[in-house]
Design a protein with these regions (language model features):
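Glycine-centered coil/turn sites that cap beta-strands in beta-rich domains
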Residues: 290-312
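Structural beta-strand segments of beta-rich domains
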Residues: 175-181, 308-312
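N-terminal exported-region signature
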Residues: 1-176, 190, 195-286, 291
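Structural motif
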Residues: 180-190
Length: 312
């Protein structure tokens, strides 16, 4: 790592690098004695988390891995790179694993934060739409895979990305989980396209879910996913990340594992809470927001002023 990131280290821009392999998570911090670091090598086919102080384009020299490169996957989580030159959609990149019912989930991370792909949910609920050269991805599989390879991506083409608006109040960290679900509103107004806030016990905003209404087009997609039961006009909550605390900073900037999370819309809080896990996996919720008046009044019976008794 000291060689691979020498330029960043020389500019005092590198904070930390973490990797994940057969022995689990490992770590490199340029500010500590070398014997305290457990990440000792940057290896082909792997992905790495790199935290820097200032935005920078990282360049590296070497021989292209080529389309025939293969990498073993362990059962469970794997942090791997995408080594093909041309981008492709997750459904194509992992078609073999999906066909074998071996792929559980894929997560990525970009300019808008964390994104998510689950082959078992309708496509519109996924936010990871493209695998790109130079990026790394968390891939979870049920069973180990010997010699995983990406299929040929074909000609270079522009893949439509999933546009995600991000609230600057939310601190995007490398600790996160995902959430989606359904929502109902009772005795109150709401607007499709608004967002339900996800806050910690202390009130910190750590995520938002967009309210979407089920359309005819979505119902067509549900035909391939019989376990999903929805009707036209039902309100769903779009898949979104919930960010946890960044251990590299002194201040608390995200949810703490085990902490209860609250859901708020227009200052009204849902009764349901969930626990923050930070496992990168998906939680599902069924929220209900209900307007409950906090003030009542009795008014004079009218237009009969001669009757001094009113029955309620």
């Amino acid at each position: 790592p000291a060689d691979a990131f020498a330029t960043l280290i020389g500019e005092s821009n590198l904070v930390v690098v973490t990797g994940y392999g057969a022995t689990g998570a490992n770590f490199f911090d340029p500010t500590v004695p070398p014997f305290l670091n457990t990440l000792t090598s940057i290896d082909e086919g792997f992905g790495y988390w790199v935290k820097v102080n200032n935005e920078v384009t990282l360049s590296a020299e070497g021989v292209s891995l080529g389309g025939g490169f293969a990498k073993d996957l362990a059962a469970g989580w794997n942090l791997i790179g995408y080594w093909l030159e041309n981008s492709q959609e997750p459904a194509d990149a992992f078609a073999t694993l999906i066909g074998e019912s071996n792929l559980v989930v894929v997560t990525g991370y970009g300019a808008t934060g964390a994104n998510f792909y689950d082959p078992s949910v309708p496509p519109f609920l996924n936010t990871l739409s493209s695998l790109d050269n130079g990026s790394g991805y968390w891939v979870k599989v049920n069973s180990a895979v010997d010699g995983f390879t990406y299929p040929a991506a074909g000609l270079a083409r522009q893949i439509a990305s999933m546009h995600q608006e991000t609230n600057p109040e939310i601190v995007k960290t490398n600790e996160f989980m995902f959430i989606n679900g359904e929502v109902n509103f009772t005795d109150m107004d709401y607007t499709v396209g608004d967002k339900v806030e996800i806050r910690t016990e202390s009130g910190m905003l750590v995520g938002e879910m967009k309210i979407i209404a089920v359309t005819d087009e979505m119902l067509d997609e549900f035909d391939d996913f019989p376990e999903f039961k929805c009707s036209l006009g039902d309100n769903l909550l779009m898949t979104a990340p919930i960010y946890g605390d960044d251990w590299t900073t002194e201040e608390i900037d995200g949810a703490i594992k085990g902490e209860n999370l609250r859901f708020i819309y227009n200052d009204i809080e849902a009764e349901l809470t969930i626990e923050y896990t930070g496992t990168m996996e998906l939680a599902k919720v069924d929220l209900e927001f209900r307007f409950i008046p906090d003030a009542y009044a009795l008014r004079q019976k009218y237009p009969n002023p001669f009757n001094n008794v009113t029955t309620i």
